[in-house]
């Protein structure tokens, strides 16, 4: 596929795109594949807390990241990898300048890097006028990371396989206090650990007929291992569950605590122990990126 460059109204315009966080309301590991990847059953929900990517499509072919992230080589940055991947698959002659306002923590389990990659793929598909389908973009995204497809599809979903088989589900859009202790956790470290649970029984489909998934019927298989290895996470979780239902997201280190109102979440935030970073956010069953893309598509 070759992207269109003639009469492209998006060229040389700086356009902002949200790159939202996600939480895993539960994460069950139901097996391990021969290729080393794990078969999961997890429920993704977005939250209204996002990085912001600014992209400017250019007539020159270069891919430029104007705001490098400390400690991450540009060649290893998922933002750059995603742009290069789409450029190679589309055979476009166009380029892009990208900057990021990064507010999502790294090593937190909120999917920030995967979200950044997905936003780049979806945004450049529009700005370069490549016309790949969401399914095609998801296949590209999966090569960058297992969480990338959910951010491309843009709806809350029950995910199976490595996280790429998605079924739309609408959990309640609760308010959450998102907390992070003073540590970061490597996803690879957790998923390669010998004592990680890998044989959780698959869910009966009827178990999904609810809107509240932060109950004892669901759990995060990574959490038990993480609290053994990271006392900071263990201490934080023990404190939070005294107030409201709390669970680690992804492989951590972030923990979400569920509330029915913004005021309740803010009230507990004010009581947090020192050294804990935090923010309050609402669950979203539709990614804010979808709305931005829809508006821009109408303006072409």
Swiss-Prot record:
Coiled coil: none
Residues at which ATP binds: 105-115
GO MF, one annotated term: ATP binding
SUPFAM superfamilies in alphabetical order: GHMP Kinase, C-terminal domain, Ribosomal protein S5 domain 2-like
Keywords, comma-separated and alphabetical: ATP-binding, Isoprene biosynthesis, Kinase, Nucleotide-binding, Transferase
Active-site residue numbers: 22, 147
EC number(s) stated in the UniProt entry for this protein: 2.7.1.148
Lineage top rank: taxon: Bacteria
Membrane-crossing residue ranges in chain numbering: none
Top EC class, one word: transferase
Pathway: Isoprenoid biosynthesis; isopentenyl diphosphate biosynthesis via DXP pathway; isopentenyl diphosphate from 1-deoxy-D-xylulose 5-phosphate: step 3/6
NCBIfam families xref list: ispE
Record's function text: Catalyzes the phosphorylation of the position 2 hydroxy group of 4-diphosphocytidyl-2C-methyl-D-erythritol.
Name recorded for this polypeptide: 4-diphosphocytidyl-2-C-methyl-D-erythritol kinase
């Amino acid at each position: 596929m070759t992207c269109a460059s003639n009469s492209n109204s998006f060229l040389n315009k700086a356009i902002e795109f949200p790159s939202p966080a996600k939480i895993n309301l539960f994460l069950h590991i139901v097996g391990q594949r021969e290729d080393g990847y794990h078969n999961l059953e997890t429920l993704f929900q977005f939250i209204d807390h996002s990085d912001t990517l600014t992209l400017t499509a250019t007539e020159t072919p270069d891919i430029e990241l104007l705001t490098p992230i400390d400690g991450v080589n540009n060649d290893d940055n998922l933002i750059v990898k995603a742009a290069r991947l789409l450029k190679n698959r589309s055979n476009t002659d166009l380029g892009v300048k990208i900057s990021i306002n990064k507010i999502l923590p790294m090593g937190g389990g909120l999917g920030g890097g995967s979200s950044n990659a997905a936003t780049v793929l979806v945004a450049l598909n529009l700005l370069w006028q490549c016309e790949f389908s969401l399914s095609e973009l998801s296949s590209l995204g999966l090569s960058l990371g297992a969480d990338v497809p959910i951010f491309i599809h843009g709806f809350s979903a029950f995910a199976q396989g490595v996280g790429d088989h998605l079924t739309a589900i609408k959990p309640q859009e609760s308010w959450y206090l998102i907390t992070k202790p003073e540590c970061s956790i490597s996803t690879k470290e957790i998923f390669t650990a010998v004592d990680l649970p890998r044989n959780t029984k698959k869910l009966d489909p009827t178990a999904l007929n609810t809107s509240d998934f932060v109950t004892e019927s669901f759990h995060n298989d990574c959490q038990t291992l993480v609290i053994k290895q990271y006392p900071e996470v263990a201490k934080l979780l023990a404190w939070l569950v005294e107030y409201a239902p709390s669970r680690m997201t992804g492989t951590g280190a972030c923990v979400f605590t569920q509330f029915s109102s913004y005021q309740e979440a803010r009230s507990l935030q004010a009581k947090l122990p020192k050294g804990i970073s935090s923010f309050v956010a609402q669950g979203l069953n539709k990614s804010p990126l979808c709305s931005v893309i829809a508006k821009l598509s109408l303006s072409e």
